[in-house]
C-alpha cells in the first residue's frame, strides 16, 4: 500500500487532516471539489467547515469503521486536489 502523506493523522480509527484557505469561499469551493472526487471514489469523508478551515476524516464504515487502503487512496487523491489548487 502506498503511504499517505504525513499531514494525515490516524486518530480513533479515522484518518484526519485539516486544510486552511485564504477565504471562506475558497474553503467551500474545496469542499465541493472533495465532494465530487468522493463520488468518483464511491467513498465519502466526514467534512467540517469552520470559517476558512476544512476538516476531513476518513474511515471505512463497511469494515467496522477502521482505516483501510480505501481511505489512504482517497486521502492521496484529496492531497493531489489540494496541491493542484494552491496558489503558485
Predicted regions and their residues:
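Conserved glycine-rich FAD pyrophosphate-binding loop
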Residues: 50-52, 64
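C-terminal structural segments of small proteins and small subunits
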Residues: 59-87
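Short arginine-rich
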Residues: 10, 35-45, 83
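Short, well-ordered beta-strand elements within core beta-sheets of diverse protein domains
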Residues: 14-22
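Short amphipathic alpha-helix segments
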Residues: 26-34
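Short, glycine- and small/hydrophobic-rich beta-strand elements in well-ordered beta-sheets
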Residues: 6, 46-48
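Short aromatic-glycine-(Arg/Gly/Cys) micro-motifs in beta-strand/loop hairpins
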Residues: 1-14
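A generic structural motif
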Residues: 52-59
Amino acid at each position: 500500500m502506498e503511504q499517505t502523506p504525513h499531514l494525515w493523522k490516524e486518530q480513533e480509527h479515522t484518518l484526519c487532516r485539516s486544510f486552511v484557505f485564504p477565504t471562506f469561499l475558497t474553503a467551500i469551493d474545496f469542499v465541493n471539489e472533495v465532494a465530487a472526487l468522493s463520488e468518483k471514489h464511491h467513498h465519502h469523508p466526514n467534512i467540517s467547515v469552520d470559517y476558512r478551515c476544512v476538516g476531513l476524516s476518513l474511515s471505512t464504515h463497511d469494515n467496522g469503521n477502521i482505516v483501510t487502503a480505501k481511505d489512504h487512496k482517497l486521502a492521496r487523491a484529496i492531497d493531489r486536489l489540494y496541491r493542484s489548487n494552491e496558489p503558485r
